[in-house]
Design a protein with these regions (language model features):
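Non-catalytic cap/lid and distal C-terminal segments of serine-dependent acyl enzymes
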Residues: 1-152
Length: 152
């Protein structure tokens, strides 16, 4: 987790700072597909002050299988399924435009639904888009991302 946390710090400090300077804006949009959607989602919810929009494509958010039963605070605070239900201030996410994209052939579809249920339970505004004829692969994501960007 130390390497992951260092990676996240580079993204939030260096990449986000560069994006804000280049675009002359306060918040940045983050997106990713599959495990990349996990990273984008985790960064967005851990740093809501820096993120204006989140687009998750076929997100895979359950990281527990990577640790074979090991669990500590680093894992807890990097697992949206764990820390989001316990957040005392869900209002801090409502400025973000949040899109969770999935489809009927997406093998991680249940994960987007689970995240949506958590967000609903906390009153966090978002759009769960469950499209027909969509799966968990690049050919679907190539169509989904431009569509979602057009909705921002």
């Amino acid at each position: 987790m130390n390497t992951h946390n260092a990676y996240e710090n580079v993204i939030v400090r260096d990449v986000f700072d560069l994006a804000r300077r280049e675009c002359n804006c306060h918040g940045v949009a983050v997106t990713g597909a599959s495990l990349g959607a996990y990273h984008a989602t985790n960064i967005a919810f851990r740093h809501p002050d820096a993120v204006s929009h989140l687009i998750s494509l076929s997100g895979s958010f359950d990281i527990s299988s990577f640790f074979h039963g090991y669990h500590d605070d680093n894992i807890y605070f990097n697992s949206p399924y764990e820390y989001l239900p316990n957040t005392p201030n869900p209002w801090k996410y409502n400025h973000m435009g949040i899109i969770l994209g999935t489809g009927e052939w997406d093998n991680t579809r249940h994960e987007s639904y689970r995240l949506s249920e958590i967000l609903n339970s906390k009153g966090v505004k978002h759009w769960l888009d469950d499209g027909k004829w969509r799966g968990h692969d690049w050919n679907y994501w190539r169509d989904m991302l431009p569509y979602y960007l057009s909705k921002l």
